[in-house]
C-alpha cells in the first residue's frame, strides 16, 4: 500500500508509513467518522487506544517506539505531524514527511516502529 500521498510537501512516503483518507459524514446531529476497521488493509492487531491533546504553540516530540505501530487521527482542530526516518536498514533513511491533518484534512496516519514523530 506504499504510495505517494497527494499532500503539499509529501513527495515520497517514508517506508512503512501508510495514509488512509477518512470519510466524514455530517448531519444535523453532528459528524460521524469511521477511523479503523478489523477488515482494513492497515489493521494489524489491537493493542491500546489513547487520546492526547496539545495546547497551542506546544510541540510534542521527538520520540519513536521500538516495536509499537501508531495510528494517528486528529479529531478536533488541525495538527502538523512530522516524521523522520533514521532507520539504518530503510530505503528512505534521512527522509522527512510533514502532514497537516484534522478536520480540514481527515486522515489516519500509520507510523511504523522506529520512525521518529512529533506534533
Language model features by range: what are they?
Residues 1-105:
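Non-catalytic, conserved peripheral segments adjacent to functional cores
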Residues 101-119:
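Conserved metal-binding segment of the jelly-roll/cupin
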Amino acid at each position: 500500500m506504499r504510495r505517494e500521498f497527494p499532500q503539499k510537501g509529501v513527495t515520497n512516503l517514508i517506508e512503512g508509513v501508510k495514509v488512509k483518507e477518512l470519510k466524514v459524514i455530517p448531519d444535523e446531529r453532528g459528524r460521524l467518522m469511521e477511523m479503523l476497521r478489523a477488515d482494513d488493509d492497515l489493521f494489524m492487531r489491537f493493542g491500546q487506544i489513547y487520546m492526547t491533546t496539545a495546547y497551542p504553540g506546544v510541540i510534542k516530540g521527538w520520540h519513536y517506539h521500538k516495536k509499537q505501530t501508531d495510528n494517528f487521527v486528529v479529531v478536533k482542530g488541525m495538527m502538523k505531524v512530522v516524521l523522520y526516518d533514521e532507520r539504518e536498514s530503510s530505503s528512505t533513511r534521512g527522509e522527512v514527511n510533514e502532514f497537516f491533518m484534522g478536520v480540514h484534512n481527515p486522515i489516519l496516519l500509520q507510523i511504523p516502529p522506529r520512525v521518529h514523530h512529533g506534533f
